[in-house]
C-alpha cells in the first residue's frame, strides 16, 4: 500500500541479519539469568530475553558470510545455544531469521489512508520500541478518527497524526540505531558512541507540532505516570480522554460540558502529586 501511494522511506542505513530462537526451559536446575542481557561478545553479539514462565529467547547476530539456511539449521542452533544449555535442557520451539531496518516513511497520511506500525517505520530491536511505537500510532489515531466520525471535530484534526507521530518515531529509530552502533562498538573493543547509545544529550521526544494549547514549559511533553498505592496512575485514568486537574482548579460548567461531549473524564489530584505541573 505504501508503495502504491508513492510514499518513500527515509533510510538511516542500519541493516543487520539476526536469527531468533524461542525455547522452553526443560531443566529447572539450569542456571540462567532472570534479566534481559546484551552480550557484546567480539566473537558474536547475542541478546538473551527471559520470558514468561519457562520461555527463554536468544537472538544471534549473523557473522560475515553466514547464510540464512545455515543459521536456521537445527545443528547450528544447537551449537549457538551450547554455552547456555543442551538440547535436553532447552526445547527449541521456533527459529526465525530476519533482517531489521531503520526506516521512517516520509508521510504518514495520504487522503483517507494512514500508515501505522511497520508500514510507517521499522527500527532495530535494541531499545524495545518497535511494537511500542506501533501502539502509539494507533492510540494517537483512533480517538481522532472517532471524533471526526462522531462530528465532534473537523477532518483537519487527522492531519495532526503525521505531525505528532513522525517526528517522535524518527527520534526513536535514531536512538535504536545509536544503541545498535554502541553494541557493535563495545564488541569491537571501543565505545566511541557510548553517550549517544545510552541517550546522553538526547531530549526525551515530545510534541513540537500538532495539537498543542498554551505555552507552559511542559506543553507537549509526555504525561508523568507515578505509582499510586493501588497501582499505576494510568489505570486510574481509565480508557479515553482524561482532564487531569488539581481539586482547587475552577472550571466553568460550559467548559466541562464541552469536555463531556467527547466523553472526557475529569480526574482531580493533589497539588503535591505533580508539583512540576502545578508549581508555576
Where are these regions (language model features)?
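Core Rossmann-like FAD-binding/catalytic domain of the broad FAD-dependent monooxygenase superfamily
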Residues: 1-191
Amino acid at each position: 500500500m505504501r508503495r502504491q501511494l508513492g510514499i518513500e522511506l527515509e533510510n538511516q542505513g542500519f541493516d543487520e541479519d539476526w536469527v531468533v530462537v524461542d525455547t522452553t526451559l526443560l531443566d529447572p536446575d539450569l542456571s540462567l539469568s532472570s534479566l534481559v542481557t546484551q552480550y557484546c561478545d567480539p566473537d558474536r553479539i547475542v541478546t538473551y530475553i527471559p520470558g514468561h514462565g519457562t520461555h527463554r529467547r536468544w537472538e544471534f547476530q549473523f557473522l560475515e558470510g553466514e547464510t540464512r539456511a545455515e543459521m536456521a539449521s537445527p545443528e547450528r542452533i544447537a551449537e549457538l545455544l551450547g554455552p547456555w544449555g543442551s538440547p535436553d535442557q532447552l526445547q527449541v520451539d521456533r527459529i526465525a531469521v530476519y533482517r531489521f531496518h531503520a526506516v521512517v516513511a516520509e508521510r504518514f497520511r495520504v487522503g483517507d489512508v494512514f500508515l501505522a506500525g511497520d508500514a510507517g517505520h521499522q527500527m532495530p530491536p535494541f531499545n524495545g520500541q518497535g511494537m511500542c511505537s506501533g501502539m502509539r500510532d494507533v492510540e494517537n489515531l483512533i480517538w481522532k478518527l472517532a471524533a471526526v466520525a462522531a462530528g465532534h471535530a473537523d477532518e483537519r484534526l487527522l492531519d495532526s497524526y503525521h505531525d505528532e507521530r513522525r517526528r517522535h518515531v524518527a527520534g526513536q529509530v535514531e536512538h535504536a540505531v545509536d544503541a545498535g552502533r554502541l553494541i557493535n562498538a563495545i564488541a569491537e573493543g571501543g565505545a566511541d558512541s557510548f553517550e549517544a547509545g545510552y541517550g546522553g544529550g538526547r531530549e526525551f521526544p515530545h510534541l513540537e507540532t500538532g495539537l498543542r494549547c498554551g505555552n507552559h514549559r511542559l506543553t507537549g511533553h509526555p504525561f508523568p505516570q507515578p505509582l499510586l498505592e493501588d497501582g499505576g496512575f494510568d489505570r486510574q485514568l481509565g480508557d479515553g480522554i482524561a482532564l487531569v486537574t488539581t481539586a482547587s482548579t475552577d472550571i466553568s460548567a460550559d467548559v466541562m460540558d464541552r469536555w463531556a461531549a467527547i466523553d472526557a473524564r475529569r480526574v482531580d489530584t493533589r497539588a503535591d502529586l505533580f508539583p512540576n505541573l502545578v508549581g508555576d
